[in-house]
Curated annotation (Swiss-Prot):
Residues that bind 4-amino-2-methyl-5-(diphosphooxymethyl)pyrimidine: 46-50, 83, 122, 152
Keyword annotations from UniProtKB, A to Z: Magnesium, Metal-binding, Thiamine biosynthesis, Transferase
Pathway: Cofactor biosynthesis; thiamine diphosphate biosynthesis; thiamine phosphate from 4-amino-2-methyl-5-diphosphomethylpyrimidine and 4-methyl-5-(2-phosphoethyl)-thiazole: step 1/1
Gene Ontology terms, MF aspect: magnesium ion binding; thiamine-phosphate diphosphorylase activity
Needed co-factor(s): Mg(2+)
CDD domains: TMP_TenI (cd00564)
UniProt name for this protein: Thiamine-phosphate synthase
Lineage start: Bacteria, Pseudomonadati, Pseudomonadota, Gammaproteobacteria, Pasteurellales
Organism whose genome encodes this protein: Mannheimia succiniciproducens (strain KCTC 0769BP / MBEL55E)
Length: 220
């Protein structure tokens, strides 16, 4: 459990669709941003190629990009997680898979894997947290969205920062990473409320100084 908690500290999520604000090719922009984030000390990366302007419809290009991201993460010994796409995760031997409440069922993932990957599950209600708190096949909860976010058009209702405290007050000790509209100034507060780490997209992908951003996000 401690290894998972450490992994969640500064959890970067991105796909090419999150890098279109920069000049040049979005896939190359993603690789550049990821390399800088790895050099700065992120503790986990989730490849999330979803939504408008993503490569979701070009499976070959998506796989090639995922492999390049995986190779970068391997160089820095940082876990590489794939968002929902079980087939992709298994074919490139990703370290883990993250799923939402409406995504691929955890049981389906386990039926298709020989060696259990790291599995993360998105949580948006206390009922969901209680229902899954004792499941050994789920390694961590992604809790949110904490704040409004533009990175996901169909996000669940906001839960707010105090939701993390409520989870801990129920005696749930499952590793938790807070997600959704998190900025640098919120990270330390969320940790004090009980989060093991923060997951961000725009805070890093839009940062003008990734090294400083990662350093601030890691502060306790």
């Amino acid at each position: 459990m401690n290894k998972i908690k450490s992994m969640l500290s500064v959890y970067f999520i991105a796909g090419s669709q999150d890098c279109r604000h920069l000049p040049g090719e979005p896939t190359e922009n993603l690789l550049t941003i990821l390399q800088r984030a790895l050099e700065a000390g992120i503790t986990c990366f989730q490849f999330r190629e979803k939504g408008e302007q993503s490569l979701a419809c070009d499976l070959q290009l998506k796989r090639r990009l995922a492999l390049k991201c995986l190779q970068l993460c391997r160089q820095f010994q940082v876990p590489f997680i794939v968002n929902d796409d079980v087939e992709l995760a298994l074919s490139i031997q990703a370290d883990g898979i993250h799923v939402g409440q409406k995504d691929t069922a955890v049981e389906t993932i386990l039926r298709n894997t020989r060696n259990k990957p790291i599995i993360g599950l998105s949580i948006n209600t206390l009922a969901q947290a209680l229902a899954n708190k004792d499941r050994q096949d789920i390694d961590y909860f992604g809790v949110g969205p904490i704040f409004p976010t533009n990175s996901k058009a169909d996000h669940s209702p906001l839960v707010g920062m105090n939701f993390i405290r409520q989870i801990r007050q129920l005696g749930i000790d499952k590793p938790c990473v807070a997600i959704g509209g998190i900025k640098e100034e919120s990270a330390a507060i969320l940790r004090r409320l009980g989060a093991d780490g923060v997951a961000v997209i725009s805070a890093i992908s839009h940062s003008v100084n990734i090294a400083n951003t990662v350093k601030t996000l890691a502060q306790k």
